Amino acid sequence: MKKCICCELGYVDDGGDGICTVCGWQDDDIQNDDPDFAGGANELSLNEYRRKFKEKRKINSNYVWAESKT
């Protein structure tokens, strides 16, 4: 397991394509290396996803992606 590059709160499996249960970011080496690249495993770029996650946490400081999917 490694710390999520997007939210730095959750963890993803080593070896690629794990999904963080805190923010929902799917680990993608290309997007991790180029944070402005949209596409690949995630529709949004890493920078866009970080911004949206931070906005959600401002509205609800306890927001967790995994809970929003149920």
Where do the protein language model's features map onto the residues?
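Short, intrinsically disordered terminal segments enriched in charged and Pro/Gly residues
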Residues: 32-70
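Short Cys/His-rich micro-motifs in 6-15 aa windows
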Residues: 25-31
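Generic, low-specificity signal for short hydrophobic/alpha-helical stretches with a mild N-terminal bias
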Residues: 2-5, 31-35
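Cys/His-rich microdomains that often coordinate metals
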Residues: 10-12, 27
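Short cysteine-rich clusters marking metal-coordination/redox-active sites
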Residues: 4-7, 20-23
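Residues immediately within or flanking Cys/His clusters that coordinate Zn2+
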Residues: 1, 17
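Short, low-complexity, polar/charged sequence segments that are solvent-exposed and flexible
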Residues: 23-25, 39
